[in-house]
Structure formats: C-alpha cells, structure tokens
C-alpha cells in the first residue's frame, strides 16, 4: 500500500513477518521438538508422550542421534522466530521531492546497526531499471541506478509481482522522479 502526494511518496516494505516464514518456523520447531521428545524418553526408559512409544529405541546410538537432531533443529527455528519477532528487513522507501532526498529505511538485527537508513540525492538518480530473469523460479527486481554507485534494489527478490505489475510500478516511480526507465 503506497502513499503518494505531489511532493512525497512512501512505499512500505514487508520484512520477515510473512506467512512462509511462520510456516517454516512452525515446521522446524515441531520437527525439532518431536526428535527431542523421542530421544529423551529412550534415555529415561519411560514414555513421556503416549502417542510416541520410545521403548523400541535404544539410547545408544539412536536416542543420542534423535536428541542431537532435536537440539540442532532448535537453532534454525529459534533464528526464524527471532527474525519474525524483530521483523528484520521491514521498513520503507521515502522519495521526497521538496527536500530532494531519497531515504531507504530498513530494520536489521538488534545491536548497534539495528536501524539502517541510506540516503541519496535525487540529482544522483539516473534511471529506474527492471531486472527480469525467467526460469523455474522467476526473478523480477526493481533497481534504482545511482550515479557513481552500484544499482540499489528497491524490491525484494521474494516479492512475487507479475511482469506487468513490476513494469507499472517502475513506470509510476520513474514518472514521480522524472527519470528514464530501463527494462526488458
């Protein structure tokens, strides 16, 4: 949902709070917990969960491996839950004609550089470029060409926009910034 006036344009950017990340975090958490809850009862010699009988699992070597997989699986699930909690990668793009400034703001991981804000002068913007690579998983990214620097991506690779939507977004932004548009 973009907001635009005559002098200002704001584009919110979605971060880690996506349905796919929630699904992967749940799957890895449940899988890791399942391995761990099967490995521990094999050490204790008792069934902690009646649905998961562990009497047939010998602690050495199967129980140890199950516990190890359970503990190892908790690390990526913890990482996913933290990125969802902190909403890493979210932010906004501000295009301010009155000030002549473009600000790209993103939230990062907690610490000294949690807030990431990159500023450009509108005078340095040369063009808006659409990168399209059609394959099994197509890649469509909107870039901003900045004088004397690398191209700056404005959309995420995981943003699934159709080619038409991407071109419309690029044309709208190029019109607002009064720059040319390069594309496929």
UniProtKB/Swiss-Prot annotation:
<comment type="function">
    <text>Seems to be required for the assembly of the photosystem I complex.</text>
</comment>
<feature type="transmembrane region" description="Helical">
    <location>
        <begin position="64"/>
        <end position="84"/>
    </location>
</feature>
<dbReference type="InterPro" id="IPR003359">
    <property type="entry name" value="PSI_Ycf4_assembly"/>
</dbReference>
<keyword id="KW-0150">Chloroplast</keyword>
<keyword id="KW-1133">Transmembrane helix</keyword>
<dbReference type="GO" id="GO:0009535">
    <property type="term" value="C:chloroplast thylakoid membrane"/>
</dbReference>
<keyword id="KW-0934">Plastid</keyword>
<protein>
    <recommendedName>
        <fullName>Photosystem I assembly protein Ycf4</fullName>
    </recommendedName>
</protein>
<keyword id="KW-0793">Thylakoid</keyword>
<keyword id="KW-0812">Transmembrane</keyword>
<keyword id="KW-0602">Photosynthesis</keyword>
<dbReference type="Pfam" id="PF02392">
    <property type="entry name" value="Ycf4"/>
</dbReference>
<comment type="similarity">
    <text>Belongs to the Ycf4 family.</text>
</comment>
<feature type="transmembrane region" description="Helical">
    <location>
        <begin position="22"/>
        <end position="42"/>
    </location>
</feature>
<dbReference type="GO" id="GO:0009522">
    <property type="term" value="C:photosystem I"/>
</dbReference>
<dbReference type="GO" id="GO:0015979">
    <property type="term" value="P:photosynthesis"/>
</dbReference>
<keyword id="KW-0472">Membrane</keyword>
């Amino acid at each position: 949902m973009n907001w635009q006036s005559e002098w200002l344009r704001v584009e919110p950017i979605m971060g880690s709070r996506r349905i796919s990340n929630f699904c992967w975090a749940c799957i890895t958490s449940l899988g890791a917990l399942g391995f761990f809850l099967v490995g521990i009862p094999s050490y204790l010699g008792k069934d902690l969960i009646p649905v998961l009988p562990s009497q047939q699992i010998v602690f050495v070597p199967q129980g140890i491996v199950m516990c190890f997989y359970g503990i190892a699986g908790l690390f990526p699930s913890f990482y996913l839950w933290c990125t969802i909690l902190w909403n890493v990668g979210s932010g906004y793009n501000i295009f301010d004609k009155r000030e002549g400034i473009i600000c790209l703001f993103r939230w990062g991981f907690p610490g000294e550089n949690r807030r990431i804000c990159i500023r450009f002068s509108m005078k340095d913007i040369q063009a808006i470029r659409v990168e399209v690579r059609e394959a099994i998983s197509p890649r469509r990214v909107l870039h901003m060409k900045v004088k004397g620097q690398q191209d700056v991506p404005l959309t995420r690779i995981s943003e699934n926009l159709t080619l038409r939507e991407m071109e419309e977004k690029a044309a709208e932004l190029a019109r607002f910034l009064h720059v040319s548009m390069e594309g496929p």
